[in-house]
């Protein structure tokens, strides 16, 4: 299997695309790529239902999925969790295409986009619900990379819009995936 290695990095308070460099893609992996708040969990549920549907355990549809760039887990925990998944895996990413390994036709890529104002409204709700503990943990890990912390959201939509444009930029995301649109996978 041929893999094009990343040529850039995607670093936010919550995400670090460099973590992908420690992973080995399997030929039957499914990579679900969306900008933040653009249908990722929905598509994970669709893919998981197709791969692991069980009337006995609806929650099982999320068992074979992981979010490699999420800073909350150690890289070794991520590697171990992915290695333990039997069968096909789905990997969630918000990273642009140039920031993750992109394989040939053996790996399937599913891209999902959402209307920009809808995605931003969802980002407002998402950030408003961050617990202080979760925000502190993510900010601490991001500080190691010299990133500015996410402040507690207190209703300043204009500042949050700047954060969303920087960290969730759907235009950059699409611009990096668009040249790959004619690939078989």
Q: Which residues fall in each region the model found?
A:
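PAPS-dependent sulfotransferase catalytic domain
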Residues: 1-184
């Amino acid at each position: 299997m041929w893999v094009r290695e990343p040529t850039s990095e995607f670093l936010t308070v919550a995400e670090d695309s460099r973590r992908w460099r420690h992973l080995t893609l399997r030929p039957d992996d499914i990579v679900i790529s969306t900008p933040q708040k653009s249908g990722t969990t929905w598509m994970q549920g669709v893919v998981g239902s197709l791969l692991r549907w069980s009337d006995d355990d609806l929650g099982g549809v999320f068992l074979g999925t992981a979010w490699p760039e999420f800073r909350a887990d150690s890289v070794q925990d991520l590697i171990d969790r992915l290695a333990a998944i039997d069968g096909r895996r789905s990997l969630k990413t918000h990273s642009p295409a140039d920031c993750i390994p992109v394989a040939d036709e053996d790996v399937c890529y599913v891209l999902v986009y959402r209307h920009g104002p809808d995605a931003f409204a969802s980002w407002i709700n998402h950030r408003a619900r961050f617990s202080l503990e979760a925000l502190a943990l993510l900010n601490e890990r991001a500080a190691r990379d010299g990133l500015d912390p996410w402040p507690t959201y207190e209703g300043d939509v204009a500042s949050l819009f700047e954060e969303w444009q920087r960290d969730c930029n759907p235009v950059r995301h699409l611009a990096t995936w668009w040249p790959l649109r004619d690939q078989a996978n």
